[in-house]
Amino acid sequence: MRRSSWQKSKDLVTFPLRAVSLFEQDRFGLSSLRTERFDYVAAEVQGECLDVGCGRHNLFIRDFLNGRGKGIDVFAYEGLEQENIVEDITRFPFPDASFDSVTFIANLNHVPAPKRDPELAEAWRCLRPGGNIIVTMGNPLAELLVHRVVWLYDRLFKTHHDMDSERGMEQEEEYYLIDAEIVARLKKVGFARIVKKYFGTQWGLNALFIGWKDMHLES
């Protein structure tokens, strides 16, 4: 499922077309935006991964990591098993140091603000020393436009692209988070060496943040 250099070149050139087409599956020899996100994140995952907010069918773990990890979500999306459902997002059902990577793919903004620090603290707890957290977030303007376009598209064509509307938005969820908040929250719970990497084939309008649970902090 990982993209070749040739595939990335095609995706780079056709990004505007892919962005407005809203297709969820790869088509016409082009990658969907979801495939693109998953590809960038998978490149940063090490070992066993916990995907928080995994969504329908637990696709990232299933298809991009070949089952190497666990996916959890608070909503019983299509294709999820009971083991994937976590009612309290501030308490993950895993022992300390269970995973090598934890991912939040395009969803930390959908965690209600008062629960973001506790949930990130759980990610820290579940990571092994030397493990990393990976958070993706789009450009604020792009995120606002995408949410509006997807919402309108679903209503006009009776499709179901908008998972946020499917489960219902809670108070204190947001359409995007600014970089400063993401970095500050990661640092607050203990993550170090935080870097931002842009999605080149999405023209820099999406990016991932990587933070590390340094080994010396556990000694």
What do the PLM-derived regions correspond to, one by one?
Residues D117-P129:
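A short glycine-rich, Lys/Arg-flanked "PGG" loop and its adjoining helix->strand segment in the class I
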Residues M1-C49, G55-R91, I134-S219:
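Class I (Rossmann-like) S-adenosyl-L-methionine-dependent methyltransferase catalytic domain
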Residues N109-V111:
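A short His-aromatic
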Residues A42-A43, D96, L120:
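A short, aliphatic-rich alpha-helical micro-motif
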Residues F104-N107:
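A short beta-strand submotif of the Rossmann-like class I SAM-dependent methyltransferase core
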Residues T90-V102:
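A short acidic, Gly/Pro-enriched loop at the edge of an enzyme's catalytic core
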Residues G47, S98, G130-G131:
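Surface-exposed loop/turn positions
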